[in-house]
């Protein structure tokens, strides 16, 4: 076999680079967290716990087996925050940023990998878009930290500076990690700031901006408020995001938070409608919410954010395409439509495939944990939705799980972040699709 063909066969596809890149960063993070300097007690943390924490950070989830604020030292927290930033931006984007800073030329293969990593439509302009992402990310995170600085410095003194920076990056990257400590062995998250408009509004804005996707930012910045000039995908993302914030917020407002004053009740309803779509912060006790509200939160966790964003989940566009396809079927139209444009049939197939994959992971993981740990299925469904949607919300069972159940959640977080289709494309890289067509036959549906 010629040497050139051997090199071509050995070359990794962009999808393989993405999944291996995430795995490599997770492993490195887990090893760093095992160092005695990473903990406040100065001991060595078991590998399964550091692997869980590193996976949760890189996959911007927020589920933890040890409290981030009290268990990990300043060094350990810095490692976790670095992993969150890398996971939020994407391993490939971070690697490309170092290449840009060093002045090296970006090859066509690297540009193609960057395109796949941020779900860009084409290779052209990808370097400009990467620069835009990096500048926008650090500017927004800086503004978020400055907005929260007064509240945290008031409560924590100079340590409030680190608190503001940590929570700004964690919120923008939709990670949900906090360093506010524990109360009665529970993780209160931001419940201590439920009445603080400054903290609530800042965190909500960071979550939404981080979750709508880098391409949508670019579209909005280029076309300003001229909605009619946005790409169809940007329009779909913005409208779907708005609906997924307002409708659940109305439901939560009427079902929960009766004891709160009107202003705090509205604030709590809005926050709890935004955070399940992959952020992981909470300003109320989640276990005290009604069963209906918890069910809605599970759906929101599975849906997640938008393509090419810091968020995970099935993505808002997947939901929108499935709903539009159902509407087209009811109206006897041949294809789904958005804003006067048809949706490609391949997109509908992809959306259906993603839905089936997430449901299989969601129910399969919950069933295993429920049987193995002898826990109620409802609590396990909440936890697995949080893991596969890379959310980080919990009803409190994650720290109690044994190693096999932790491995299940680690797998779900990883698959939820890199994306099931990325793994499929990586496995099928280099394989040619067959051109043969089998005879067609009708099958009755419904």
Language model: regions and residue ranges:
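Membrane-proximal intracellular helices of multi-pass ion channels
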Residues: 1-446
């Amino acid at each position: 076999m010629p040497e050139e063909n051997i090199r071509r066969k050995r070359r990794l596809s962009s999808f393989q680079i993405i999944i291996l890149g995430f795995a490599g960063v997770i492993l490195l993070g887990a090893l760093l967290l095992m160092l005695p300097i990473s903990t406040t007690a100065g001991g060595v943390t078991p590998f399964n716990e550091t692997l869980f924490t590193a996976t949760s950070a890189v996959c911007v989830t927020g589920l933890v087996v040890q409290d981030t604020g009290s268990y990990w030292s300043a060094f350990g927290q810095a490692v976790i925050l670095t992993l969150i930033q890398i996971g939020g931006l994407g391993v490939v984007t971070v690697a490309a940023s170092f290449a840009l800073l060093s002045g090296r030329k970006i090859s066509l293969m690297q540009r193609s990998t960057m395109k796949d990593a941020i779900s860009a439509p084409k290779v052209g302009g990808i370097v400009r878009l990467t620069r835009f992402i990096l500048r926008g990310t650090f500017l927004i995170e800086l503004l978020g930290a400055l907005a929260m600085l007064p509240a945290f410095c008031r409560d924590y003194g100079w340590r409030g500076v680190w608190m503001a920076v940590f929570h700004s990056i964690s919120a923008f990257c939709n990670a949900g990690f906090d360093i506010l400590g524990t109360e009665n062995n529970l993780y209160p998250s931001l419940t201590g700031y439920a009445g603080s408009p400054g903290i609530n509004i800042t965190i909500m804005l960071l979550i939404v901006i981080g979750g709508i996707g880098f391409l949508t930012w670019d579209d909005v910045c280029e076309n300003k408020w001229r909605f009619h000039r946005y790409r169809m995908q940007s329009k779909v993302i913005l409208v779907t995001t708005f609906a997924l914030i307002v409708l659940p917020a109305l439901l939560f407002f009427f079902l929960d938070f009766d004891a709160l004053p009107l202003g705090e009740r509205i604030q709590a309803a809005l926050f709890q409608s935004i955070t399940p779509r992959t952020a992981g912060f909470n300003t109320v006790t989640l276990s005290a919410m009604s069963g209906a509200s918890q069910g809605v939160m599970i759906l929101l966790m599975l849906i997640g954010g938008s393509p090419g964003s810091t968020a995970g989940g099935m993505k808002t566009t997947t939901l929108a395409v499935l709903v539009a396809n159902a509407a087209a079927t009811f109206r006897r139209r041949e294809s789904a439509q958005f804003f006067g444009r048809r949706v490609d049939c391949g997109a509908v197939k992809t959306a259906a495939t993603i839905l089936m994959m997430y449901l299989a992971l969601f129910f399969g993981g919950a069933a295993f944990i429920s049987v193995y740990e002898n826990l109620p299925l409802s609590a396990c469904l909440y936890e697995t939705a949080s893991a596969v949607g890379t959310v980080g919300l919990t009803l409190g069972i994650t720290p109690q799980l044994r190693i096999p159940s932790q491995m299940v959640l680690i797998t779900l977080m990883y698959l939820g972040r890199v994306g099931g289709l990325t793994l499929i494309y990586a496995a099928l890289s280099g394989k040619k699709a067959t051109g043969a067509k089998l005879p067609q036959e009708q099958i009755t549906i419904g």
